[in-house]
Swiss-Prot record:
Enzyme class: transferase
Catalytic activity of the protein: D-glucose + ATP = D-glucose 6-phosphate + ADP + H(+)
CDD domains: ASKHA_NBD_GLK
Full protein name: Glucokinase
Subcellular location: Cytoplasm
Organism name: Agrobacterium fabrum (strain C58 / ATCC 33970)
Entry GO terms, CC: cytosol
Residues reported to bind ATP: G17, D18, I19, G20, G21, T22
Length: 340
């Protein structure tokens, strides 16, 4: 892909939006030298649509009127009407151009934005898990347990970073250890298989906890991922503690598989709130042991660093990084950019 031409640069100010199923976060980037200014975070359920949220929560409350916008959304981007996953909003870029005074609208995948973020993430915004030394221009991977399991790669070629989104959250996870073979029969399946998102997300954390309880012959007492996490970290509940241990193991296995696929000597990054909350569990031996247990390539795996992304607004940071210097990225915009 050729470098971005001057005609593809966006005009400032640029509204940046990280649109999730529950929350929508907005920042504004005044120029290419500025840091993004966080404007607001809104609950998607409180607004009938994204245009209403932008108008009422952003435009009506700031004198900085954006000319362009880049939105990162959870869901496939196809056509001129883009429904969001786990949310009633539908993004209609042509309507945004007509109603909100914008001249340029770009819509990308939420984990493309996470991939853009890890291109320039500094030490203050990541927590190392285990050892390993990063190769600055080598491929990288980001995965994030959240509402689902997001996955993206970041590949350097032709003097540019190329984000590579996908549906890696739906890869198979299978049993390996003796304990796995006891627990896995009780994990909820999708058409007979256990996919990544059946375990490695908030809902999956609950699925795993319930499976452990069934394997132990006891009734589950928790139904909220936050309760399982807090009880597991404190060690006050044996099943919750094992849930975090197995969750870390399975996350390590999947992260290791993705590292091999991308030859991610630039590092594997764990994004999202769940990863941030369970850092103590991830620093226990299980995660790195599972990550490195990839014979015949265990020696290679020991050299690949792993991090938890601790930036509070990583997706917005990634969008800002791209907006400042789009020529540094091979971001495909066919069918994902609308202009007035």
């Amino acid at each position: 892909m050729p470098k971005t031409s001057d005609t593809e640069y966006l005009s400032f100010p640029i509204l940046l939006g990280d649109i999730g199923g529950t929350n929508a976060r907005f920042s504004i980037l005044i120029d290419s030298f500025a840091e993004p200014v966080h404007l607001t975070t809104v609950k998607t359920a409180e607004y009938p649509g994204i245009d209403d949220a932008i108008q009422q929560a952003v435009l009506d409350k700031t004198s900085l009127q954006p000319v362009s916008t880049i939105l990162a959304i959870a869901g496939p981007i196809e056509g001129d009407e883009i429904p969001l996953t786990n949310c009633h909003w539908v993004v209609k870029p042509k309507d945004m151009l007509a109603k909100l005074g914008l001249k340029d609208v770009i819509v990308i995948n939420d984990f493309e934005a996470q991939a853009l973020a890890i291109a320039a993430l500094d030490d203050d915004n990541r927590e190392p898990i285990g050892s390993g030394k990063k190769d600055m221009l080598a491929s990288r991977v980001v995965l994030g347990p959240g509402t689902g399991l997001g996955v993206a790669g970041l590949v350097y070629a032709r003097h540019m970073w190329f984000p590579v989104p996908g549906e890696g959250g739906h890869i198979d996870i299978g049993p390996r250890s003796a304990r796995d073979y006891v627990v896995f029969p009780h994990i909820e399946t999708i058409e007979g298989r256990v996919a990544g998102e059946q375990i490695l997300c908030g809902r999956g954390l609950v699925n795993l906890y319930r499976a452990i309880c069934k394997a132990d012959g006891i009734e589950p007492v928790f139904s909220d991922p936050a309760d399982i996490t807090s009880q597991g970290l404190s060690g006050q509940n044996a099943q919750a503690k094992e849930t975090l241990s197995l969750f870390s193991t399975y996350l390590g296995r999947v992260a290791g598989d993705l590292a091999l696929i991308f030859m991610a000597k630039g590092g594997v990054y764990l994004a999202g709130g769940i990863s941030q909350k369970i850092i103590p569990a991830l620093k226990s031996p299980e995660f790195r042991a599972a990550f490195e247990d990839k014979a015949p390539h265990s020696a290679l795996m020991r050299t690949i660093p792993t991090f938890v992304v601790t930036h509070p607004q990583a997706a917005l940071s990634g969008l800002a990084t791209y907006a400042r210097t789009p020529a540094d990225f091979g971001l495909a915009l066919d069918g994902r950019r609308w202009r007035a």
